[in-house]
């Protein structure tokens, strides 16, 4: 393949055997697309804001005389950009303005005559906007809205699996779930009666619902039952025969016709008997009269002469009834066909327990159940039932629900509305009865065809609709009050409920989460997370095992590996690499189409519903060069996800890639196929906790997923258009765009500003470093600057470390690690953490708080780092307890002694009126102040420091914009110069004249003169734009800040803390192999090899076999090989060998193995080969894709090429004695991560501090500056030792003996080291508790 200039800098050798058919899709699509549909720059009324407005408007007054109509909406421009919102702590949002039309009808004239129309734009609150990276900035912090996996609307048939009733009888039920509205359930009880529930309330016989729909008993019976006809002829009873219905029954009498006995009495009727009856064309047989007794009449039989109902429908026929019927002149009787096998009499039985008899009584019964205690009226009962299922305002199945409903009932797809029809309800009951009769299957609720994804856009739309409905009620009330003269749409609408609903969703919904910003991977994973929790979802406590388990339909849609450990396991999932959602919200995954055993290039996305009907081959099936399957039988997933062997011609589809199954995080684990699933889960989760190191180091052994993740995460800067790098410094990159990519008439310059040392949500450091040089060509979509944890555009979460697997004096017992001092010296795992500390000056009842350097009772030394405004200098080194911002708070007047009054009068001392409430550095923290920001309320005078900061910001803004203008002007004048030279002006003349005068030249060629004039206009436009931008920037910087009520000033101080690795820090590999550092060992004591090269970390070999994560061993071997090749290249460069030799050696390395990647170095120039070699000196980066990785033979070949033993084991020597260890040791390079569980954040010690109010015992936990709990078991230990005095001390003066501990302090100050323990407070608490029980207990102190 052809590589671009940037790609040639470092090429990762891939061992993947299968070529990539489909590139990894953009990883944040699920977030961006969903919100784009909500915002809808291009209106389509089916979804988003437009749909919400259309569903609520027009709002008509109760008397119909006025209506408020919706015309259109538009979103304005946000006031501040994303970065400014983060600094100021505001929400990044755009104002929503809606054009509404108020129409008044003339009530006297004919209907529909318009009297008056008023149209107006109405402000409806702010809508938060999504940033380019799929996040929201809410109150200055970046948040992510996690997608939710919820039960799809539609109808579900289920059973209790025999768990409800003691007999173990399986009870079936059906549930109609709408998108919004009341749930309707049907269920069988143990007696086989069918019941209905509305909104999970008290159950009613299901036939009440049918009666409420307007059906009579007769209609209900004819809907659910087949009929059997009996004829009365000459006192004989003839039955119409349908032979098929007899199958499986025992004949109650001889079945005979035309003198031939077909089945004798007592014999079972088989299929053979039925065939004979059909062959002979028997349609009627004589039956004994008793046979009809007990059968159920299918309709009402009325005596026509008297009008009396002889036999009502659903009545069992007795001999007397039969006599009455024949007396009334009936020759034919219709009864219901039922049997015990597969035609149960359920509806007939249910009608018998149904207390209602017509529509009204049924509606009243439903009304009583829904609104107990209210007196029902006919209108109220009708309105309630209609509104529940048949009103589009209150009930909506949605397009998804209707599609699922129709599929379930085998109706035509795409037909039907969002409300239920009579046929829908009867259809559900019919199918439920069919299932009870043994025909049909219940649904699998965990099937991904029955669960759908609700993403940001949809949830935001629902919240917005809720807000709109609240507004609708208020508007309708206002319209119905009358007196609408001179009223405008603006007066009617109060936008508060809308913005409140939206704000609540983005600010405090369970699915609106604080973004995990540890590193680029954790950001991407958080945005691709799918949660089953949240509003309308499951709860941790009630979710069973089945919901959490991996389901066959997860294949290629949800990752089976990446899920949290703990109570949320299986409820929070991650999207697989290639998965996406379809229009209905179901997850789908791509497949290659197979036609007649040949795999085509066509790619189709299938959802779980569709996939069940096809046979699908795995991605690693063997194909020949014509893309035909080479095996006679291929392992495939057949129907229902069961795997089996199939012939090539029976296969419909083939997987797209071996990493299709797993998520982004799991796809980063090399040799995942050799790890146990539990450890892989830990590996995937721990990569998200890796802290970005000071210098990112790409993994030597990767999987090829590193680049797409780094690109899509948005932490790096990516070229918008191709071109040549014109300027580079630490804070900006300027690219001169290629001619063919510029828009005619623009300067063709792209300017990229870099983010420098800012704080992430997890207090890690975000910093961008350019990775291109001056004059380099860049293509569109290539990386220009690396962000945190990226190295030349590849994700780099940790460091490549030389490890040895061997025990070392017990320092690697129980997963601990022994680390060499060299790792600390080289700052391999040094990280920068940035903390934000803020100080708020409020207006209190006693007066305003003041930020000042004049603090009472504080010595000079404590104020040495503050300026005259009382704010710390940038660059100051501070430690725990230092003052960062001096602040004083007024305190209440105290009664003064006469002496104090005198002193006050003489010296005018006012200092005692205020108390010190300064912002101090928290205990245990130390660092450097890297930035200070001061926010002042509008109308409050700015202090000196605020004005200095403002001035600096203005200077920077002006410098930035001036530079930008210069760059753009330079580009423009280059084009002017070329144009003038082409037009016949000599270069010498041009050089004499000032640049600005060039634009005044006149050319003979008219076309060229036009171009020149165009460029002159552009130049003028650039100048105006510069002035405009500068003015906007100036206003933003100068204006006061919008602070919370009662806040006058906020000072934010940013501290940077540099943390080196130390004992107690947690580290991990990518295979779930985690541990804590036990000791930092001097380099000279570490084991070393024959070349004198020491290892950097010693790991315990016993941690591997029982955990079954062998991937780490293979990674270690492959890492050694990669480093070995790097060492060889390094040696060749040092020996200054010819480029030809280098090229040959590197080519050999890239050609090794059976991978599908081909790198042809003969197309590289010598300079490019040298630059590639320079980047490979530290090791050849390798990629071993998931489930398609390097084979053992390839690893051995690579080790050989690097001049290393193929066993991967090396003889080591003890650094302390110089003795050889008795057997070779596995040594190699493993990619190690430093996790965000640092000992500095956990270390904590207390001498004195705060106490609990009731028990008077010290508080617990680091955040409260609490003590260590000395619990029950610890007390036992001291009792066992007989350490009585220690125990007494622990339980009294060190805990809750208030007087004792005060005395103890006094004694220590006085220098008498005694303790006088008293009564612990907890005894008094016990006393009070016993008294609360009504027992008077007193302590007698004698």
UniProtKB/Swiss-Prot annotation:
Catalyzed chemical reaction(s): RNA(n) + a ribonucleoside 5'-triphosphate = RNA(n+1) + diphosphate
GO annotation (BP), single: DNA-templated transcription
EC number: 2.7.7.6
GO cellular component assignments: DNA-directed RNA polymerase complex
Record has Transcription as a keyword: yes
Keywords: DNA-directed RNA polymerase, Nucleotidyltransferase, Transcription, Transferase
Gene3D superfamilies in UniProt: 2.40.50.100, 2.40.50.150, 3.90.1100.10, DNA-directed RNA polymerase, beta subunit, external 1 domain (2.30.150.10), DNA-directed RNA polymerase, subunit 2, domain 6 (2.40.270.10), RNA polymerase alpha subunit dimerisation domain (3.90.1800.10), RNA polymerase Rpb2, domain 2 (3.90.1110.10)
Gene Ontology molecular-function annotations: DNA binding; DNA-directed RNA polymerase activity; ribonucleoside binding
Complex formation: The RNAP catalytic core consists of 2 alpha, 1 beta, 1 beta' and 1 omega subunit. When a sigma factor is associated with the core the holoenzyme is formed, which can initiate transcription.
Protein family per UniProt: Belongs to the RNA polymerase beta chain family.
Biological role: DNA-dependent RNA polymerase catalyzes the transcription of DNA into RNA using the four ribonucleoside triphosphates as substrates.
Listed name of the protein: DNA-directed RNA polymerase subunit beta
